[in-house]
Design a protein with these regions (language model features):
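Charged interaction segments
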Residues: 21-106
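Short, extreme N-terminal segment that most often corresponds to the first beta-strand
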Residues: 1-26
Length: 106
């Protein structure tokens, strides 16, 4: 059985409709812990997942908005198993920042 992970996300964008739709998709697909408010094109929210960062689900959500000014950062953690991940969506693609960082140091 996979453990429950906490995800803290920051979603920003200049197109308010796209921003609202991405946030709606996240809240529809995952259990959100906090009240969701958009302020000046930015929203911070917290949600849970069964297991690590839900890359496939997030890619499916963001694939709908190619070429849009959309920036998403997600920190995923589950402390009992020492899991920490940092993913960024920028310029139409997702990157795993910690994986990149530690591959460069090896």
């Amino acid at each position: 059985m996979e453990n429950i992970c906490t995800n803290i996300a920051v979603v920003t964008g200049t197109d308010k409709q796209v921003l609202e739709q991405v946030i709606k998709d996240i809240s529809k697909n995952f259990e959100c812990y906090t009240d969701i408010e958009i302020d000046n094109g930015c929203c911070e929210l917290e949600f849970s997942t069964n297991g690590p960062f839900p890359r496939e689900a997030m890619e499916a959500m963001t694939k709908k908005y190619p070429g849009k000014d959309l920036y998403i950062q997600v920190i995923t953690y589950e402390l009992p198993n020492e899991l920490v991940q940092h993913h960024i969506y920028e310029n139409g693609k997702w990157t795993d920042k910690l994986k990149e960082k530690y591959q460069q140091n090896n």
